[in-house]
Amino acid sequence: MNRIAEKTAPSAGAELRARADIVSHTLTKTVSNLLDRAIAAARDALVARQTAAGYWLFELEADCTIPAEYIMMMHFLDEIDAPLESKIAAYLRSHQAEHGGWPLYRGGDFNMSCSVKAYYALKLAGDDPQAPHMARARAAILEGGGAARSNVFTRIALALFGELPWRGVPYIPVEIMLLPRWFFFHLDKVSYWSRTVMVPLFILCTRKPIAKNPRNVHIRELFTRPPEVERDYFRDSLLQGGLLGRILLAVDRLSRLIDPLIPKAMRARATRAAELWVLDRLNGEDGLGAIFPAMVNALEAMAILGYPSDDPRRVTAKRALQKLLVIGPSSAYCQPCVSPVWDTALATLAMQESGCTASLAAATRALDWLQTEQLLDEPGDWQLNRPGLAGGGWAFQFGNSYYPDLDDTAVVAWAMHQSANSADYSESVRRALDWLVGMQSANGGFAAFDADNTSYYLNKIPFADHGALLDPPTSDVTARVVTVLARIGRPQDRHALSRALEYLHAQQEPDGSWFGRWGTNYIYGTWSVLMAFAQAGVGPQDAAVRRAVDWLLSRQNSDGGWGEGNDSYAKDRRSERKCASTPYQTAWAVLALLASGEAGSDALRRGVNYLMRTQQADGLWSDPHFNAPGFPRVFYLKYHGYSRYFPLWALAAFRTLSRTRTSH
C-alpha cells in the first residue's frame, strides 16, 4: 500500500473548500496539510525509484525513427533478433497516427521521413504491404510526395539499402577528415552530435555498401517516380538555402565529378583517419557519443571495414546499442540515449526543496554518485576550442567522457552547492564553475557542448537540411549557468555573469518570452531565464521580468495549468502553441512565477491547484506528451521523468515561499 493511502482522507467537501482557500490566497491549516500530503506522496514515490547506486534514471523516448532504424540495422548486418524485431514492430504499429503515417511526437502532423522509415521497418519485419495499416501508410507517404521527399538522413539510409541512387544524397567523402582547420568546413566547426554521426557516415558514404537485406525487401512503391529517374532530391535545399544554399549545392555537384580523380593513397589515409577517430571515441558499452545515430553508424562502418562480428570492439559497439532498448511484454523500443545525470540532478533539486530527512538523505546519495561521474582530466573535443582549460563538467549519460555538457554541469553544481553537505563537494563545484566560465562564447551566451560553435553558414550545406549542424549558445543553457554562477557568487565570475545577463536580455522575444532550445518551448525557456534573473538580482519590477510574467499569465489555461505543444517550433504556427495543460509545463510556470514576485497571485495558486488536482494515487503525475526537442522541427523527445520531479519541485517551492511569507 502506498503511503498516501495509509492516511485518512478528508471529505470531498473539505478538500474542495481547501482548494478554494488556495485560490483565495490563504494557506490555512487544512490547505497546508493537503499540500504536505501531496509533497510527501510525490517525494516517497520518487525516493522509491532511486537506484541503490544513488542515481535516478527514467526512460527517454523518441519518435518512431529510432526503433525503425534498429530494425533496419539488423537487416543491414543480417543479424536479426526475431523476437525483438516482433516487439519493435508492435511498437511501431501502435504509434501509427490517424493520418496514416507517423508523426515526430504524439498528436503531431504527418512526417515523411519518420513514416518512410517506419513503413520500411515494418515491411522488413514481415508485414504484408497490402495489410490495411500498410496501405494507409503508403497512401499518406505518396500523398506527401513520396520517399524522395525524405530528409537527408533517411535518404542515406535508403541508399544503403539500394532504394535510391547515391546522387540522391549529399556528397560527403571521407577525405573531409584531411581538411585543414582553416577550410570553410571542418569537423571542429560542427556540433558534437554532428561529428559523431558524420565521421562513420563518411566511411559508409564513400564505400557505398549495399545492405545484406537477407529477405530482399524493397520499397519502390513509396516513390512517385522511379528513384533512378527522380531528379528532385534536393528541392528543399534549393527552396530553403537561398543563394548560399544554391552555391553550396553547385559545389556538391562539382565535387562528385572530381571524386574519381582522388588518389587511392589519399582515400586510404582518410579512411584510416576516420576509423581511428571512431575507435578513439568508441566509449565502451556507452557507445560513440553515447547517442543512437552515431552508434549505429559506427557499428555499420566497422562491419564495412571488415571487422568480424566477433571482434571485441564490434561486440562492444553492438552491446552499447542493445543497452538502449526498453523491452516490455508485448512491445519494445530503442531510446536515443539515456539521461541518468540529468534525471539525477533535477530529481535532487526537487528532493532538496521538499526538505524532509528522507529527501535530504536521498539527495546526498545522489550527489555522492554524481561526484564520481565528474569529468576532470579526460580528453574531450571541447578542448579543441579551449585548449588551456581544465576539465570539470558532467556528461548527460553514464559514460561520455569526450562530451560533457554545460546544462548538466550547471544543474549538478547548483545541487551540490545548496546541499547541507556542500563542503564535501566544494572542489567539485569549483572545478565545475571554472570549466563553465571558460566555455562562455564570444556573444556572452553558453551552448550545450561547445564554445563559439557558430559557423551558421554551414546550416546551408546540402547535408544540413535538419538545420541542427551547430551548437550555438541558447537562452536556456545560458540561464542555467547564470543561475549557478549567481547563486554561488564568486567575485571572479562577475564579468562572465554580466555578459551572460546581457545576452539573455537581448534574446527576449517581442512578446516577453524566451525560446526553449532543449525543452518545449517558450514556457521552458521563460522559466529558465526567470529563475536565473531571480538568482542574479534582476528584480520583479524589471521591465523584462514584467513582460515575461505578463506573457506567462496570458498563456494560462482555464483549468489553472499551462500547456504548449511542439508545433510551437514551426515558424508559421507559433500562435498555436497554447494547448492542453501538462504537469511539467505547469510546474515550470509555477516556478517561474515564484521567482518573479508572484507568490500571492491568483495565477500561481490556480497553477498549484492544478498540480494537486492532477496528482495520481501513487503520488506521481502522468502525461503522454513529448516534452523536448532533440532538434527543433526534426526530432523530439519524451523525458519520462519530467512529470515525476518537476511537479514535486514546484509544490515544495510554493510551500517554502508561502510559509516564509506567512512567518513575516
Q: What positions do the PLM features span?
A:
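Preference for long, amphipathic alpha-helical scaffolds in soluble/luminal domains
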Residues: M1-H664
